[in-house]
Amino acid sequence: MSLDIVILAAGQGTRMRSALPKVLHPVAGNSMLGHVIHSARQLSPVGIHVVIGHGADAVREQLAADDLNFVMQDKQLGTGHAVAQALPALTAETVLILYGDVPLIEVETLQRLLKRVTPEQLGLLTVKLDDPTGYGRIVRDDQHRVCAIVEHKDATDAQKAITEGNTGILAVPASHLQDWLGRLSNNNAQGEYYLTDVIAMAVNDGLVVATEQPHDAMEVQGANDRKQLSELERHYQLREARRLMAAGVTLRDPSRFDVRGEVSVGRDVLIDINVILEGKVIIEDDVVIGPNCVIKDSTLRKGVVVKANSHIDGALLGECSDAGPFARLRPGSVLGAKAHVGNFVELKNANLGEGAKVGHLTYLGDAEVGARTNIGAGTITCNYDGANKHKTTLGADVFIGSNNSLVAPVDILDGATTAAGSTITQNVPAEQLGVARARQRNIEGWKRPVKITKD
């Protein structure tokens, strides 16, 4: 059965008190609308149609993709009117309607809903709530069949007592949708064209309204203000924490842990408090991540240890390598197996061979470092001449003394040593000592300056 998905994302979101369109406000590092689109793609539709209005240019700019069709709703005249704007582009047998400010909806829930759709039956997602204030109420007959949805502002006191609420998410046979939308009226308290009115039309036309419910009511929670947005954020993070713990991760405190991307994990991983995982992160078995670390778009091989307060971005850490505390690995950094990067070390586009050591207070940019090479404290690669970047190459078993400046381009070959305090501007041959510093001179009779005293 072919599927079109319509995502309603035209609302202004005035209660957010923001110039940013409501659907672009982030949850876990991705916009709310971005989460909905991600779920929609997993259903393999023939088309994803995003109805936009307020802040349309910003939405297009942030989320433009070949598989998205943006449809303009110039005037916000209700959800039924919004879906009608997408009608000319719909070609599939079934239409699923989602909302751009409901980011936590699970793909499995939508799959169950879609299974309810036949040419003579539509699927409606409802939710049981302790306090359904603000939700449209699901009205059922004496045989428990859905017969209508009544919006909260139009409901009688008896209808307001109903605890089954409408989520707005429904899947309908496309063959009926155009007719129902054409018959909508705005004769209601809001003066809008309610999509929910198609339920009563379907019943009157002899169709069955089959309902499904999410496993968790937060799946269908929207965000109309910053408080609700924060609630979605926290629920998402706890959900991700539970998923990782089920996969074999120990989290010191699941409430102090954030995922802001796509994370895959091995077994027996230990993650301390205040760790943020961003982008695409791969963590293999037996990895340990200390507190207050950020890991972004990186791969941590088996047995890696990242110590406290380290920032790893776009890096590959080989088996049993370690970094930190207070290490910064920037994009293009690679640590070979058992390589060591210590405190206050920054790497950028640098490749450390197996067993190489950079203990502390060092910057290596655009560098190739051979196996077992040791780099002393205070060393920097001078890789930028003001116009272009240049490479520093260190062979295997090199020893770089403390407080060295390696002025690229420069090669220091296998087994070479550089003396402490050197500024290396020329290649150092294998097994030789490079010394590049002024000779020490001791001045006899020298007197320290004396502070001038004021009268």
Curated annotation (Swiss-Prot):
Pathway linked to the protein: Nucleotide-sugar biosynthesis; UDP-N-acetyl-alpha-D-glucosamine biosynthesis; N-acetyl-alpha-D-glucosamine 1-phosphate from alpha-D-glucosamine 6-phosphate (route II): step 2/2; Nucleotide-sugar biosynthesis; UDP-N-acetyl-alpha-D-glucosamine biosynthesis; UDP-N-acetyl-alpha-D-glucosamine from N-acetyl-alpha-D-glucosamine 1-phosphate: step 1/1; Bacterial outer membrane biogenesis; LPS lipid A biosynthesis
What's a single GO BP term from this record? peptidoglycan biosynthetic process
**UniProt EC number:** 2.7.7.23, 2.3.1.157
Q: Name one GO molecular function term.
A: UDP-N-acetylglucosamine diphosphorylase activity
**GO CC list:** cytoplasm; membrane
Binding-site positions, Mg(2+): D101, N224
Annotated catalysed reactions: alpha-D-glucosamine 1-phosphate + acetyl-CoA = N-acetyl-alpha-D-glucosamine 1-phosphate + CoA + H(+); N-acetyl-alpha-D-glucosamine 1-phosphate + UTP + H(+) = UDP-N-acetyl-alpha-D-glucosamine + diphosphate
Sites binding acetyl-CoA sit at A377, N383, Y384, S402, A420, R437
Q: What is its main location?
A: cytoplasm
Any one Pfam family here would be NTP_transf_3
Q: Which residues bind UDP-N-acetyl-alpha-D-glucosamine?
A: 8-11, 22, 73, 78-79, 99-101, 136, 151, 166, 224, 330, 348, 363, 374
Give disulfide pairs as residue numbers. none
Q: Keywords in UniProt for this one?
A: Acyltransferase, Cell shape, Cell wall biogenesis/degradation, Cytoplasm, Magnesium, Metal-binding, Multifunctional enzyme, Nucleotidyltransferase, Peptidoglycan synthesis, Repeat, Transferase
Its EC top class is transferase
Sequence segments annotated as region (N-acetyltransferase): 248-455
Region described as Linker: 227-247
* Cofactor(s) needed: Mg(2+)
- The record's region (Pyrophosphorylase) falls at 1-226
Entry's localization field: Cytoplasm
Matching InterPro entries: Bifunctional_GlmU (IPR005882), GlmU-like (IPR050065), GlmU_C_LbH (IPR038009), Hexapep (IPR001451), MobA-like_NTP_Trfase (IPR025877), Nucleotide-diphossugar_trans (IPR029044), Trimer_LpxA-like_sf (IPR011004)
Kindly state what the record says about how the cofactor is bound. Binds 1 Mg(2+) ion per subunit.
Task: Give the positions the UniProt entry annotates as the active site.
Answer: H360
Quote the HAMAP family the UniProt record gives.
GlmU
What the protein does comes down to: Catalyzes the last two sequential reactions in the de novo biosynthetic pathway for UDP-N-acetylglucosamine (UDP-GlcNAc). The C-terminal domain catalyzes the transfer of acetyl group from acetyl coenzyme A to glucosamine-1-phosphate (GlcN-1-P) to produce N-acetylglucosamine-1-phosphate (GlcNAc-1-P), which is converted into UDP-GlcNAc by the transfer of uridine 5-monophosphate (from uridine 5-triphosphate), a reaction catalyzed by the N-terminal domain.
Q: Partners and quaternary state?
A: Homotrimer.
Task: List the protein's name.
Answer: Bifunctional protein GlmU
In which organism is this protein found?
A: Pseudomonas syringae pv. tomato (strain ATCC BAA-871 / DC3000)
